[in-house]
């Protein structure tokens, strides 16, 4: 292999490897501590392969707040839905550490799935 082809191969390989690095998301739940995952949370960590979305799900029920920040295979709609005792909101994004913010939502089709998480 001549030097030009070798250089091209190395550059292409490095570019391809950097383009396929895994997404990083904040990953925590309020079950790990009362304020944990609400206003303070760990550094973002690498998601498993095929998990291309960061999600944040906030559930309020009778004044109590539960938060789940995680990696996900599918994108959740950015919506909120009222429940009998509060609401469930979800937010999805696809860039590193994007699930830290306060924007969130969910819809009625996701409610049965989301309720199984808590």
Curated annotation (Swiss-Prot):
| Tissues in which the UniProt entry reports expression | Expressed by the venom gland.
User: Keywords for this entry?
Assistant: Disulfide bond, Secreted, Signal, Toxin
Q: Where is the signal peptide?
A: 1-22
InterPro entries membership: Snake_toxin-like_sf (IPR045860)
Provide the record's note on post-translational modification: Contains 5 disulfide bonds.
Chief location category? secreted
Q: What molecular function does GO assign, one term?
A: toxin activity
State the compartments where it is located: Secreted
Q: Which GO terms describe its cellular component?
A: extracellular region
Identify its protein family. Answer: Belongs to the scoloptoxin-05 family.
Q: What else is known?
A: The scoloptoxin-05 family has remarkable similarities with the three-finger toxin family commonly found in snakes.
Q: What is this protein called?
A: U-scoloptoxin(05)-Cw1a
Q: Which organism is it from?
A: Cormocephalus westwoodi (Westwood's green centipede)
């Amino acid at each position: 292999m001549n030097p030009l082809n070798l250089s091209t191969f190395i550059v292409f390989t490095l570019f391809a490897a950097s383009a396929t690095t895994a997404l990083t998301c904040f990953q925590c739940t309020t079950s790990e501590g009362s304020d944990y995952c609400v206003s303070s949370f760990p550094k973002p960590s690498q998601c498993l392969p095929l998990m291309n979305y960061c999600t944040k799900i906030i559930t309020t029920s009778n004044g109590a707040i539960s938060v789940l920040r995680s990696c996900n295979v599918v994108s959740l709609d950015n919506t909120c839905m009222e429940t009998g005792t509060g609401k469930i909101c979800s937010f999805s994004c696809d860039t590193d550490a994007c699930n830290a913010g306060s924007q969130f939502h969910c819809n009625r089709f996701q409610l049965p799935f989301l309720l199984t998480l808590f």
